[in-house]
């Protein structure tokens, strides 16, 4: 019903935060599910959104403490396949302030890197050491996911799955 109202009011884009397959679902009805079940539920919902909203960018945070191994990256690739019209946006875990409770925890764990604030860009670099990855392994997985997401095949599928407007 909310989507119908948004469509009637001319909403052209939505940028929902999926964030993670394992945590940060408390903003939606997915707080009690994770992994494959969350992938399936969210994929179905985002595909349905395209009946009302022409552009949906889905946002993910990579490198959260709940992420370990290849699974979070592989689930995200499967999301790209299951919801080809969605434009995925990837952010790397970064702390932009010093007083947030989570940042204080990272500081206690000596995981915050000394990085000038003016150079922070959570799309290219992060200032929090990943809990469950070595740097090279983490960035190899990020590069692999990005290459998959923006491959010719994926971009073609995204283009073909998107309703095109003449305006």
Predicted regions mapped to residue ranges:
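A structural motif corresponding to the C-terminal lobe/cap of the Radical SAM core domain
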Residues: 1-166
């Amino acid at each position: 019903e909310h989507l119908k109202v948004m469509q009637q009011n001319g909403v052209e884009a939505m940028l929902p935060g999926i964030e993670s397959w394992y945590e940060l679902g408390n903003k939606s009805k997915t707080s009690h599910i994770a992994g494959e079940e969350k992938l399936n539920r969210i994929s179905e919902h985002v595909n349905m959104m395209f009946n009302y909203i022409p552009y949906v960018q889905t946002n993910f945070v990579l490198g959260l403490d709940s992420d370990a191994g290849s699974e979070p990256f592989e689930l995200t690739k499967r999301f790209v396949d299951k919801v080809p019209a969605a434009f995925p946006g990837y952010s790397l875990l970064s702390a932009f302030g010093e007083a947030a409770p989570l940042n204080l925890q990272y500081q206690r764990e000596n995981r915050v890197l000394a990085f000038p604030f003016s150079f922070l860009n959570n799309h290219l670099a992060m200032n929090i050491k990943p809990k469950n990855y070595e740097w090279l392994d983490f960035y190899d997985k990020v590069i692999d996911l990005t290459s998959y997401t923006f491959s010719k095949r994926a971009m073609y599928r995204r283009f073909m799955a998107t309703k095109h407007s003449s305006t």
